[in-house]
Amino acid sequence: METASFKTKLGWISVKKKSNRIFSLSFGKSNKKTDFTNIKNQINLYASGKLKNFNIDYYFEGTPLQKKIWKELSKIEYGEVTTYGLIAKKVGTSPRYVGNVCGQNKLLLIIPCHRVIRSDGKLGGFSGRGGIKLKKKLLSLEQNVQ
């Protein structure tokens, strides 16, 4: 397993890679050093509003239902939002469970759980370092770039 951290326009990002595929991307700093120039460049392009879709080889680690939810989340387009309830209906579970699975997302930005909000229009939670403040920042970035 390779791990690296780097500073981006969104702050420190930590990435973990196994068998040449990303399985974890999170906000925060790690002490390990590996070259992830391609990922760093893509995140900075995203943060500048110049990249809407990541071209990164990754995989999910989780239960079949978690994987189904994350696959559904990955379909949410840049600048769009959906609700926990709508995702829940598509995969046959509860909105609360969808929220819990979003909180376990290890591929932040790549699997855009920040694009999922409550049915009343409130943001809900966000597991990335920085919480709701960061979720607002990401949604604002995407809304302003369209």
Mark where each language-model region is.
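Basic nucleic-acid-binding alpha-helical/helix-turn surface characteristic of O6-alkylguanine DNA
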Residues: M1-R96, L141, V145-Q146
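Generic structural "secondary-structure junction" signal
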Residues: I56-G62, R118-S119, G125-G128
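Structural signal for hydrophobic
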Residues: L73, C113-H114, L138
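Residue-level detection of the helix-turn-helix DNA-binding "recognition helix"
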Residues: G103
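Acidic, glycine-rich catalytic loops of TOPRIM or P-loop NTPase phosphate-binding modules used
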Residues: K106
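Short Lys/Arg-enriched helix C-cap and helix-to-coil transition segments
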Residues: L109-R118
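…primarily DNA-binding HTH/wHTH and HhH modules…
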Residues: K122-Q146
